[in-house]
Amino acid sequence: MVDLARRCSGSTEGRFLMWECTKWCGPGNNAKCESDLGPLEADKCCRTHDHCDYIASGETKYGITNYAFFTKLNCKCEEAFDRCLTEAYNKEEKESAKSSTKRLQNFYFGTYSPECYVVTCNSKRSGRDAGCENGVATWKKSYKD
């Protein structure tokens, strides 16, 4: 819970970088509580994405160190986020909301293009389940790799 609070608190300087019409899409969040969402369907995707397994900048986890300036997430989370944004786009009725969602998706996966990691268990199962206590991770250029 401490990690979640640290990750979601964000700095006040980063608050102006929040994606339009959202409370969870950007550095940290500006929601009053877990159920506080902006009007875009994509905000639900961002909230879920914010709670994903991650390796913070400078942190070592699963045998790898994140030397990048930004937090990196598990590739499963990145794939789920991309899929969720596509579904959010399809649910939106207003053209402006569709456009904002598509721009968010294009920015995140096109411009920002985050690297991610895959956790593997010694038994070769994909990590983060109850039976994988000592998972080992490897970096990927994208969840699509």
Curated annotation (Swiss-Prot):
Cofactor annotation comment: Binds 1 Ca(2+) ion.
Compartment(s): Secreted
Enzyme Commission number(s): 3.1.1.4
Propeptide: 124-128
PANTHER family found in the cross-reference section: RH14732P
Tissue-by-tissue expression: Expressed by the venom gland.
Subunit structure: Heterodimer composed of a small subunit and a large subunit; disulfid-linked.
UniProt cofactor(s): Ca(2+)
Disulphide bonds in the chain: 25-46, 45-84, 52-77, 75-116, 121-132
Protein name: Phospholipase A2 phospholipin
Catalytic residue positions: 49
InterPro entries registered for this protein in UniProt: PLipase_A2_dom, PLipase_A2_dom_sf, PLipase_A2_His_AS
Catalytic activity of the protein: a 1,2-diacyl-sn-glycero-3-phosphocholine + H2O = a 1-acyl-sn-glycero-3-phosphocholine + a fatty acid + H(+)
Task performed by this protein: Scorpion venom phospholipase A2 (PLA2) that contains enzymatic activity, but does not inhibit ryanodine receptors in contrary to imperatoxin-1, another heterodimer of P.imperator venom. PLA2 catalyzes the calcium-dependent hydrolysis of the 2-acyl groups in 3-sn-phosphoglycerides.
Family designation: Belongs to the phospholipase A2 family. Group III subfamily.
Molecular-function GO term, any one: phospholipase A2 activity
Pfam name, any one: Phospholip_A2_2
